[in-house]
């Protein structure tokens, strides 16, 4: 489990198509394979494949998968304190969010990405937390209003709750409940799509949070 590297600060692979999962849903099997192996060169290759596919097709599903992959890559870089590498990726991510905003079917995901963007900017410049923090909270309200049934919205809610101070509403218990809601939504209906690294990552984030809460039994259950 330690090979799964992408616990984000505020914090889808080897099939035929990079930007489309085997059964036609959104997801990159190259990115997924990178996630489970911990091979970051493969992750970057997956982003290149997605970028090439989006240049050919301009498909919203591919754009979402590309932005999601970059979201994960930025989290990885910030987690390693590689801010010089993360900074240009954050600006590219911001541009991808604005492109995604033109597709109404991805409104909830767009608003969730905007929450994450505030987090990334604070990660790059912690001194800006006093000004960006309240904006992030307001954006989180927008995201929740846009997509209470979207697991990615609940992931950003959990990331925010896990890292914000208690006086601003932060709570590890609330964050754990939000991660569990995200997992429940991933599992609803037919379950998570193939090649979806975010589902696995949410289990890891929940497990790591429970470890910090000294709930080792809960953490073991999350990892399993």
Task: Label every model-predicted segment.
Residues 126-189:
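Extended amphipathic alpha-helical interaction segments
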Residues 14-20:
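Boundary at the C-terminal end of the N-terminal hydrophobic targeting segment
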Residues 43, 50, 90, 94-97, ...:
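Hydrophobic/aromatic packing residues within the alpha-helices of TPR/SEL1-like helical repeat arrays
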Residues 20-33, 56-79, 105-124, 149-165, ...:
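Amphipathic alpha-helical repeat scaffolds of TPR domains
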Residues 51-65, 96-110, 141-150, 183-196:
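Flexible helix-coil transition and linker loops at the boundaries of alpha-helical arrays
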Residues 4-12:
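Sec-dependent N-terminal signal peptides
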């Amino acid at each position: 489990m330690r090979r799964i590297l992408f616990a984000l600060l505020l914090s889808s692979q080897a099939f035929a198509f990079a930007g489309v999962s085997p059964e036609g849903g959104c997801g990159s099997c190259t990115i997924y394979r990178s996630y489970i192996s911990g091979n970051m060169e493969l992750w970057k290759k997956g982003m290149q494949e997605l970028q090439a596919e989006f240049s050919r097709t301009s498909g919203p599903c591919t754009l979402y998968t590309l932005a999601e992959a970059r979201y994960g890559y930025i989290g990885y870089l910030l987690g390693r304190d590689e801010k010089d590498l993360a900074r240009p990726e954050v600006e590219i991510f911001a541009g991808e969010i604005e492109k995604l905003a033109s597709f109404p079917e991805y409104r909830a995901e767009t608003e969730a990405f905007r929450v994450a963007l505030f987090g990334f900017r604070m990660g790059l410049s912690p001194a800006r937390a006093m000004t960006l923090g309240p904006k992030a909270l307001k954006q989180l309200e927008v995201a929740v209003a846009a997509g209470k049934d979207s697991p990615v919205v609940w992931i950003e809610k959990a990331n925010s709750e896990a890292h914000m101070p208690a006086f601003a509403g932060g709570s590890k218990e609330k964050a754990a409940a939000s991660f569990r809601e995200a997992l429940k939504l991933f599992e609803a209906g037919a379950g998570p799509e193939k090649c979806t690294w975010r589902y696995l990552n949410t289990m890891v984030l929940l497990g790591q949070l429970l470890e910090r809460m000294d709930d080792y039994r809960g953490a073991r259950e999350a990892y399993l």
